[in-house]
From Swiss-Prot:
Superkingdom assignment: Eukaryota
Region (Disordered): 18-48
Organism: Xenopus tropicalis (Western clawed frog)
Gene3D superfamilies in the cross-refs: Cation efflux protein transmembrane domain
Record field: catalytic activity: Zn(2+)(in) + 2 H(+)(out) = Zn(2+)(out) + 2 H(+)(in)
A molecular function GO annotation: metal ion binding
Segments on the Lumenal, vesicle face: 89-91, 156-169, 244-251
Binding site for Zn(2+) 1: 100, 104, 225, 229
Name of the protein in its database record: Proton-coupled zinc antiporter SLC30A8
Family: Belongs to the cation diffusion facilitator (CDF) transporter (TC 2.A.4) family. SLC30A subfamily.
UniProt binding sites for Zn(2+) 3: 45, 47, 366, 369
């Protein structure tokens, strides 16, 4: 290839910019920035398309922090009320619900810490930054749900085996009704819905793919916590109504705790699957490998695509890397630009890395160039 080979690594807007060259600047004087072939006056930078993704990420984090702070305050107030009410009533179900709220509060703090970490700049050791801290925090929150639910199921079984306890139905009913109201408020605060639209620049665009932005991982984990508590609160209210009208049916307290604990565990399955997909660097839900490949092949001059990888740093920070082969080596710059702009226009990628290669350099026997299995 003519000239020295150069590679550029440019960080996000909030981080420092680095330029790594194979040869030192002493041997090669600084060159003017690359310009568009058709219009020498216009400049094309490889990260021009990342601004929307960066701005969306900043809005997402600010929005998530605000929701988590409000939810934490409300959660703390109702935890205090439930602990006092459950102690007075002698109800395991009420104390169980308070324990769930306490775990929720802890998960909110974990989520806030992970959001703070994920906003830190990248380093030479962590070149992607701390984005995965958000995923790890969400995973920790899900694990705490399983642990606490397991403890509560054990306590419910103990009460079924040894029914030597009394319950104040009136206090239990009042407390459980307040708890249900608290969880409904928390669910409304943490609920998020999104659509695959971009409103940047006053435009209203639709992505060509079926991808829809997923909920922030921290908010999603917190929401799952609250949904679990909502199920638990419903179970407490049901058992409270039974005990209030039929005090001799106090077994309803541990039975409802046991039954609704199963529903709590079921609510974590989907979010746990998505978190593990991110950690395993799997293709994010809603983005199809074949669609991305076809959009690259549709660019004039691209003859083949291999080493195509799709993964995500967080739920909504999707990354693409690929090698493309062309028989028009003289237009490598134009092909690189067209492919990059095409995939950014059709898919919500946070970062795209494309390597252009001459088609005669391809090796059919190369194991790294094989098409992935279904």
């Amino acid at each position: 290839m003519k000239g020295s080979e150069e590679a550029y690594l440019v960080s996000d807007k909030a981080t420092k910019m680095y330029s790594l060259t194979k040869d030192s600047e002493k041997n090669h004087p600084s060159k003017p920035p690359l310009q568009d072939e058709e219009n020498p006056q216009s400049k094309y930078h490889c990260h021009n398309n990342n601004k929307k993704a960066y701005d969306a990420r900043q809005r997402e984090q600010t929005f998530a922090k605000k929701k988590l702070c409000i939810a934490s305050l409300i959660c703390f107030v109702f935890i205090s009320a439930e602990i006092v009410g459950g102690y007075i009533a002698g109800s395991l179900a009420v104390v169980t619900d308070a324990a769930h709220l306490l775990v929720d509060l802890s998960s909110f703090f974990i989520s806030l810490c992970s959001l703070w970490l994920s906003s830190k700049s990248s380093t030479t050791r962590l070149t992607f930054g701390w984005h995965r801290a958000e995923i790890l925090g969400a995973l920790m929150s899900v694990i705490t749900i399983w642990l606490v639910t397991g403890v509560l199921v054990y306590l419910a079984c103990e009460r079924l085996i040894r029914p030597d306890y009394t319950i104040d139905g009136t206090v239990m009913l009042i407390t459980s009704a307040c708890a249900l109201g608290a969880n409904l408020v928390l669910a409304l605060i943490l609920h998020q819905s999104g659509h695959g639209h971009s409103h940047a620049g006053g435009k209203h665009e639709h992505m060509a793919s079926e991808y829809k932005p997923q909920t922030n991982a921290s908010i999603r984990a917190a929401f799952i916590h609250v949904i679990g508590d909502l199920f638990q609160s419903i179970s407490v209210l049901i058992s409270a109504l039974i005990i209030y009208f039929k005090p001799e049916y106090k077994m309803a307290d541990p039975i409802c705790t046991f039954i609704f604990s199963i529903f709590v565990l079921i609510t974590t399955v989907t979010v746990l699957r998505d978190l593990l997909t991110v950690l395993m660097e799997g293709t994010p839900r809603g983005i199809h490998y074949s669609d991305v490949k076809q959009s690259i092949l549709a660019v004039d001059g691209v003859k083949s695509v291999h080493s195509l990888h799709l993964w995500a740093l967080t739920m909504n920070q999707v990354i693409l890397s690929a090698h493309i082969a062309t028989d028009i080596v003289g237009e490598s710059k134009r092909i690189l630009k067209d492919v990059t702009q095409n995939v950014f226009a059709r898919f919500p990628f946070h970062s795209v890395t494309i390597q252009v290669e001459p088609i005669e350099d391809q090796s059919p026997e190369c194991m790294f160039c094989y098409e992935p299995t279904q």
